[in-house]
Amino acid sequence: MKYFLAYNSWSKTEIAEVAKVLKSGNFTMGKKVYEFEKKFAKYFGSKFAVMTNSGSSANLLMMSVLKYFPKFLKKKKIKNPNIIAPAIGWSTSYFPISQCGFKIKFVDINIKSLNISAKKVEKAVDKNTVGILAINLLGNPCNYNRLKEIADKKNLILLEDNCESLGSKYKNKYTGNMGLMGTHSLYFAHHIQTMEG
């Protein structure tokens, strides 16, 4: 038996919608994207949504906001700021951290959920820690009660890479909305997709 990473699941309606976009000559941004952003934000209970070409780019955008708009950081003027991240994730979760000038401080996972261990996070926080990146792996939400508690106590920002868990909930709230910012992915191999995004 063969298992494919992805396969063509486009309906006639979806193909017709893609054709409309192609015929319009407006391939990026535009009315359809604006409508999607508004509906996406409303559905998932977020104030805002910004569409990018991929979850990888969304992660880079999220970290760039912290680099270029440090007012969002709770700790100011840290010389060597670090962000705590789980030891299991995707390279596209980690590269943006270092690309934007932050050090990555890896911590171990909880073996039952495969997500970041709140106990390990608490022990890893030091004077240069400015944030926690929680990655909701394979539809499993992190322990946000504990992560928020740690972030509040230690004056840190909480960020989410929700690219692998669109539609997951933690205590009746969609993941991707637990911290300051969260990212999602609609890549072709995911359960809900827009081809590349």
Regions of interest found by a model, annotated:
Residues 1-26, 31:
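N-terminal "arm"/small-domain region of PLP-dependent enzymes with the aminotransferase-like
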Residues 7-8, 87, 137, 185:
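Conserved donor-binding loops in enzymes that form glycosidic bonds
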Residues 26, 30-82, 96-100, 106, ...:
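Phosphate-binding glycine-rich loop
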Residues 68-153, 157-162, 169:
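PLP-dependent aminotransferase-like
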Residues 160-195:
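Conserved active-site segment immediately N-terminal to the catalytic lysine
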